[in-house]
């Protein structure tokens, strides 16, 4: 499935465009210009056109900054899709920083790289918090890995620890986002074809990327859900969220927030995959979010 000729042409044009923009972004980033936050969106918008990605957005993007966007994660394509819509940096696994080319691009987009070991969690939380204190917009993929695109996996609530922070005396704004790859050349992408877009499990990146480059035009639906915060999630869960909640309440509120985000995102993905038809809301998991 797909055209090797199309794949080769797209790869060459993509590399040409990328190597043209890399030195520009490196200079504005080193100089501390505000353009360093905005240039990646222009770069990724062009990349979407080059790669045949038709991005369809629904919902309003929360205007407040700082903000933490929470999204499901299906493929490396998610980065280009989201960054074509909003000026953001990503919270990514540390090993991505060592990937050829993609690691460099992640650094130029001011990504925050985190280790999986729990011993590093406080340092990572402080680093993310410092970025938010500077008014940044960050994206977290709390599934911790990519999925097959047919479902949203449990969220790791530990990644929501930064949501306990306040911004200008108010709880940090959180906005869930759903991403779904729904059509190929105008035809619905069924469950059996979704692995052509989703990258997960033991799939090799070079081979999968080559197949993606050879495909036609992929329609990606991105849904921005209503914003919320940890205080709102705590209140909805029946927790006593006062001015100084205890550790147990904070932990429970973090899990409640993770599940509210996951429920909204999973429902959005399900509706997109169903062609926009209404589907039953996805209830929070009874056992709570994964730690």
Describe the predicted segments one by one.
Residues 59-62, 127-133:
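Short amphipathic alpha-helix with an adjacent loop that forms part of the alpha/beta core around
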Residues 18-26, 30-34, 49-50, 65-119, ...:
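Catalytic core of membrane glycerolipid acyltransferases/transacylases, capturing the structured
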Residues 128-129, 136-138, 142-155:
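Soluble extracytoplasmic domains of inner/organellar membrane proteins
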Residues 1-56, 284-291:
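N-terminal membrane-anchoring alpha-helices
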Residues 236-247, 255, 260, 266-291:
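Cytosolic-facing loops and C-terminal tails of multi-pass membrane proteins
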Residues 102-103, 117, 149-244:
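A cross-family acyltransferase "interaction/gating" segment
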Residues 66-68, 137-141, 173:
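Residue-level preference for the first positions of well-ordered beta-strands
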């Amino acid at each position: 499935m797909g055209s090797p000729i199309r794949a080769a042409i797209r790869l060459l044009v993509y590399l040409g465009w990328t190597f043209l923009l890399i030195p520009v972004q490196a200079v504005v980033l080193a100089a501390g210009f505000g353009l360093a936050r905005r240039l990646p969106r222009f770069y990724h918008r062009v990349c979407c056109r080059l790669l045949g990605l038709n991005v369809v957005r629904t919902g309003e993007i929360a205007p407040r900054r700082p903000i933490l966007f929470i999204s499901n994660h299906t493929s490396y394509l998610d980065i280009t899709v989201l960054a074509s819509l909003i000026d953001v940096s990503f919270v990514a696994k540390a090993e991505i920083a060592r990937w050829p080319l993609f690691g460099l691009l992640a650094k130029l987009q001011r990504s925050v790289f985190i280790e999986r070991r729990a011993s590093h969690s406080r340092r990572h939380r402080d680093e993310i918090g410092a970025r938010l204190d500077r008014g940044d917009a960050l994206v977290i993929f709390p599934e911790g890995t990519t999925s097959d695109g047919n479902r949203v996996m449990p969220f790791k609530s530990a990644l929501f620890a930064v949501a306990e922070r306040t911004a200008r005396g108010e709880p940090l704004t959180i906005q869930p986002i759903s991403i779904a790859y729904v059509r190929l050349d105008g035809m619905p992408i069924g469950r059996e074809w979704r692995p052509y877009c989703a990258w997960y499990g033991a799939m090799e990146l070079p081979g999968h990327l080559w197949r993606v480059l050879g495909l036609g035009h992929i329609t990606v639906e991105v849904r921005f859900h209503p914003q919320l915060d940890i205080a709102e999630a705590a209140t909805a869960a029946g927790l006593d969220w006062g001015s100084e909640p205890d550790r147990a309440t904070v932990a429970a509120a973090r899990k409640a927030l993770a599940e509210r985000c996951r429920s909204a995102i999973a429902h959005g993905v399900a509706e997109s995959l169903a062609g926009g038809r209404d589907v039953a809301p996805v209830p929070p998991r009874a056992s709570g979010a994964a730690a």
